[in-house]
Regions:
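Active-site core of glycosidic bond-cleaving carbohydrate-active enzymes
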Residues: 377-401, 405-412, 464, 471, ...
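Helix-terminus loop motifs that line ligand-binding clefts
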Residues: 124, 128, 364-371, 392-498, ...
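The feature captures the catalytic groove of carbohydrate-active enzymes
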Residues: 270-282, 286-313, 372-376, 419-441, ...
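Extracellular glycan-targeting catalytic surfaces
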Residues: 268-269, 279-281, 291, 317, ...
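Terminal accessory carbohydrate-recognition/targeting modules of carbohydrate-active enzymes
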Residues: 25-337, 706-707
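Conserved oxyanion/phosphate-binding beta-strand-loop segments in alpha/beta enzyme cores
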Residues: 120-133, 331-373, 604-605
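Bacterial Sec-dependent N-terminal signal peptides
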Residues: 1-26
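Active-site acid/base region of carbohydrate-active enzymes
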Residues: 223, 227, 232-242, 247, ...
Length: 707
C-alpha cells in the first residue's frame, strides 16, 4: 500500500504542476505574505537566482543618436539610431539593421585571448554615472579599461578609453594588449537582442580599412582616432598566427592556481591589423595607453580632429561626469536614501532614460526610444509613456515635453493604429507595431504633464491636439454601441473596435486596448475640468458611460474561479493571440487605473485567483517555466496592494524587480528574466522598465490614492 500511495501522491503532484505551471521550488507565496512578520518577510527577501548580467551598458552623452554600448566582453561599439523609420517599412528596417557599426575589441596576453564575459566586472563612475570601468584577471595580470565619452558638437562624440594592466605576480611579466578597430554590418556582428548574450572568437572579424600611422588611426584616408602611450610600446601588427599547442603549452602551472587557462572559444589564433601595446612590467607595476576615437566617421571636421588631439582622457572623463550631473538641478526632485544603494539607482535610472531620448536637432524634440539594441529605432508609445510619466514626478519636465512633441507629431502623420476603426483622424500613431492604445497613452502623458508643470504655453499649444485625440476615442466607442440583430447586447458594446492590441495580439483585447484608452480619456477629462473647458461636462458623461460599458463587459469576462479573461471571444477569423502574453497583458490594471475598485468582490476574487494560480514565487508575469516578463505586472500590482493596505505584498513586488529586473553592477533594466540564464537580457536597457521602477520606488515613499 505504501508504494501505491507514494505513486498516487506523485501523479497528483505532477498533474497539479502541469495545470498550474508550478514546481515545489516555484510556489506562489503572496497568499500567506500578509500573515508573516516583517522580520520573516525581510529574511525571505533573499536571492534565489542569479541576477541578469549587464549586457548593454550605454555610455554615450545624453540625447545623442550615436549610441555607445559597452558589453561584458569589454567590447565597445557605436551603433547609430536612425530616426523616424517605421517597423512596417521593410526597406527602412533592412537598412537600419545592416548599418555599419564601429566596434573596438581587446585581446590580452600572448598567445592572445578575449575575455570570458562571465568573469568580467563592470562599474559605473561613483556607482551611478555612465562613465564605466571594466576589469578582468588572468594569469596574474589584472586588466582594467576605463570608458568615457563626451559630446564635441551636435554631430560628433569623442570616445576615450584608458587601457591598463597590472602585474600581480612575483616576477617580471610581459604585458601585451591588442586593440581591434573595425566597422561591421550590424546584423552580422550582433545577435538579435532576444538571443542570450555570447561573445566568442567568432566575433573577432578581420577589417582591412583601418590602419595606424605613427600614433594616428585612419579609416581609409580619414583620421578617426589616436592612440597615446603612457608607458607602453605601441606598434601596428599586420599579421600573426598561433596554434592551439601554444595555448596548451602554458596550461601549467596556471590551472594549479585557478586563473588564466584559455578555453578554445576565447582563443584568437589569427591576428590581422591590430594596434599592439606591449611592455615588460615589474611585480606590482602597471602599464597604460589611451585610445581615442571620433565615433561618427562620416561627419568629421577640422574642429573634431583638433579636439581629438587636444583632449586627454582626464578631460573627457571629467566633462562626461559633469554633463551627466546637469539634469539634476534645484528644480528637480532630491532624494536621500540611506540603504540598498537606492540613491545611486535612482540617479542611474533617470540618466538611462535620458540617454534613450534621441535628439532631433532639426525639430528640437526627443524621439523616445525603448532601448535594447536590435529595435532601438522604433517608438512604442505605450512603453514611452511608461518611461516618461515617472520622470514628471522627478521634475524632468523639459525632457518629457520634448518627447511629447515627438509623440504628438505622430498624430495624423501616416503611422496610425491598426484596427477596424471608423477613422484614424485624430489618433496618435507609433513607428513600432501599431497598437490601438497609443492615443490613450499619449493623452495620459500630455494631461499629466500639465498637471505637474502647470505650463500655460503647453496648454495653449496642445489643447486642440488633445481634443482631437479625445474625439477620436469617443467616436470609436460610440460606433460600437450597436445591439445584435436579436436585440441583445454584445460584449463589444461601447468598447474599442477590433484592433491590434500588442506585438502579438489582435482582436477585442480589453486588457491592452480599452483599459489604457479609458485611462487616457479619464486624464483628459480631468485636464478639461481643471481648465473649465466647455466640453468638460459632456465628456465626463461620456467617460462614465465608457466605464459603465467596460464594467458590464468585465463582469461577463469574469469566471466563477475568479479569473477575468483579457479578451472578448468572437468568431472573427483575424483574431491573433500570443499565448505567452496571457499572464503579461493582464486585467489587473482595471483597478490600477480606477475602472473598478480593488475592494470590489469581483476584483478580490481576481486577486485570489491570480495569487494562487498565476504568480510564481514573487513574480507576477509568468511566460513559461523559466522566463518571466519582469517589472510590468509587478508595476500593475504594487499600487493595488498599496490601495488595499497590503504593505508586505507591495514591498515584495518592488523587491522582485530590484533583484531580477535589472543588472546589479550597472543598474540596467530589461524586459524579461530567465531563472536559469542570466545572459538572457532582452531589451536591455529598457526605457519603460526604468520608468516603472522609478515609479515603484517613489510609490514606496509616497503613494497618493485619488480616492
Amino acid at each position: 500500500m505504501r508504494g501505491k500511495y507514494k505513486f498516487y501522491i506523485w501523479i497528483v503532484g505532477f498533474v497539479s504542476m502541469f495545470l498550474h505551471g508550478k514546481t515545489d521550488a516555484q510556489q506562489a507565496l503572496y497568499p500567506l505574505l500578509e500573515k508573516k512578520s516583517w522580520s520573516q518577510v525581510l529574511e525571505e527577501n533573499e536571492y534565489k537566482w542569479h541576477p541578469p548580467y549587464t549586457i548593454n551598458l550605454l555610455i554615450h552623452p545624453l540625447h545623442s543618436s550615436d549610441w555607445i554600448y559597452l558589453n561584458p566582453s569589454m567590447v565597445v561599439s557605436r551603433r547609430h539610431v536612425i530616426r523616424n523609420i517605421s517597423s512596417t517599412n521593410f526597406e527602412q528596417r533592412k537598412k537600419a539593421e545592416s548599418q555599419e557599426d564601429l566596434v573596438v575589441q581587446f585581446a590580452f596576453d600572448n598567445p592572445p585571448f578575449i575575455p570570458d564575459f562571465r568573469l568580467t566586472n563592470l562599474r559605473l563612475a561613483e556607482d551611478k554615472y555612465p562613465v564605466a570601468t571594466a576589469d578582468y584577471f588572468a594569469n596574474d595580470i589584472y586588466y582594467k579599461i576605463e570608458y568615457a565619452a563626451t559630446v564635441l558638437d551636435d554631430s560628433q562624440t569623442l570616445l576615450c578609453l584608458r587601457v591598463g594592466a597590472k602585474n600581480e605576480s612575483d616576477k617580471i611579466k610581459q604585458i601585451m594588449i591588442r586593440s581591434k578597430i573595425g566597422y561591421y554590418s550590424e546584423n552580422k556582428m550582433f545577435d538579435y537582442h532576444y538571443i542570450p548574450y555570447r561573445w566568442t572568437n567568432e566575433k573577432w572579424k578581420d577589417y582591412d580599412q583601418v590602419v595606424l600611422k605613427e600614433h594616428s588611426i585612419y579609416k581609409g584616408q580619414q583620421l578617426i582616432g589616436e592612440v597615446v602611450s603612457e608607458n607602453m610600446n605601441l606598434f601596428w601588427e599586420e599579421k600573426k598566427s598561433y596554434t592551439d599547442k601554444e595555448y596548451e603549452d602554458i596550461l601549467y602551472p596556471q590551472v594549479w592556481y585557478g586563473s588564466g587557462y584559455v578555453t578554445p572559444e576565447f582563443r584568437v589564433k589569427d591576428m590581422h591589423r591590430v594596434v599592439c601595446a606591449m611592455k615588460e612590467v615589474q611585480p606590482n607595476d602597471s602599464a597604460f595607453f589611451v585610445l581615442k576615437l571620433l565615433v561618427n566617421d562620416s561627419l568629421i571636421t577640422s574642429f573634431h580632429e583638433e579636439s581629438l588631439k587636444q583632449l586627454t582622457f582626464k578631460d573627457v572623463k571629467e566633462k562626461a561626469i559633469a554633463d551627466f550631473k546637469v539634469p539634476f538641478t534645484d528644480k528637480t526632485l532630491k532624494t536621500e536614501f540611506k540603504r540598498d544603494e537606492w540613491e545611486d539607482l535612482f540617479c542611474s535610472l533617470q540618466l538611462s532614460t535620458l540617454q534613450l531620448l534621441v535628439n532631433d536637432f532639426q525639430n528640437k524634440m526627443y524621439q523616445p526610444a525603448q532601448g535594447g539594441s536590435s529595435e532601438r529605432f522604433f517608438v512604442w508609445v505605450f512603453e514611452a509613456v511608461q518611461m516618461l510619466r515617472p520622470m514628471l514626478r522627478t521634475g524632468q519636465f523639459e525632457s518629457v515635453k520634448k518627447s511629447l512633441d515627438y509623440i504628438f507629431s505622430l498624430q495624423d502623420a501616416g503611422f496610425p493604429p491598426v484596427g477596424k476603426f471608423t477613422t484614424t483622424s485624430g489618433a496618435i500613431g507609433t513607428t513600432g507595431p501599431r497598437w490601438a492604445n497609443t492615443t490613450g497613452m499619449a493623452l495620459a502623458l500630455a494631461c499629466d504633464y500639465y498637471l505637474y508643470s502647470k505650463d500655460q504655453q503647453f496648454m495653449e499649444d496642445y489643447l486642440s491636439k488633445i481634443l482631437k485625440a479625445v474625439h477620436w476615442i469617443l467616436g470609436e466607442i460610440k460606433a460600437t454601441r450597436v445591439l445584435n440583430s436579436d436585440g441583445s447586447r454584445p460584449l463589444t458594446y461601447g468598447l474599442m473596435p477590433f484592433a491590434v492590441a500588442s506585438d502579438g495580439d489582435a482582436g477585442y483585447f480589453v486588457s491592452a486596448t480599452d483599459i489604457f484608452s479609458f485611462w487616457g480619456l479619464e486624464k483628459a477629462v480631468l485636464f478639461l475640468e481643471s481648465i473649465r473647458h466647455a466640453e468638460a461636462v459632456s465628456m465626463r458623461k461620456e467617460l462614465e458611460q465608457y466605464r459603465s460599458d467596460l464594467l458590464f463587459t468585465i463582469k461577463h469576462l469574469a469566471q466563477p474561479n475568479g479569473y477575468i479573461d483579457r479578451k472578448i471571444t468572437t468568431d472573427d477569423s483575424n483574431v491573433q493571440e500570443a499565448i505567452k502574453f496571457i499572464n503579461t497583458d493582464i486585467m489587473a490594471p482595471i483597478a490600477t487605473v480606477g475602472i473598478i475598485s480593488p475592494e470590489s468582490e469581483l476584483f478580490k476574487k481576481y486577486i485570489d485567483y491570480y495569487e494562487n494560480n498565476v504568480a510564481v514565487d514573487y513574480f507576477m508575469g509568468k511566460m513559461d517555466r523559466e522566463i518571466f516578463y519582469i517589472i510590468q505586472c509587478e508595476h500593475y500590482w504594487q499600487p493595488i496592494y498599496l490601495m488595499l493596505g497590503e504593505w508586505k505584498k507591495a514591498f515584495m513586488t518592488l523587491q522582485t524587480c530590484l533583484k531580477y529586473g535589472m543588472s546589479h553592477d550597472a543598474h540596467q533594466t530589461q524586459e524579461r528574466f530567465n531563472l536559469r540564464n542570466p545572459a538572457f537580457a532582452p531589451w536591455q536597457p529598457n526605457g519603460s522598465g526604468n520608468g516603472r521602477i522609478i515609479d515603484m520606488m517613489l510609490n514606496a515613499l509616497y503613494f497618493e490614492n485619488k480616492d
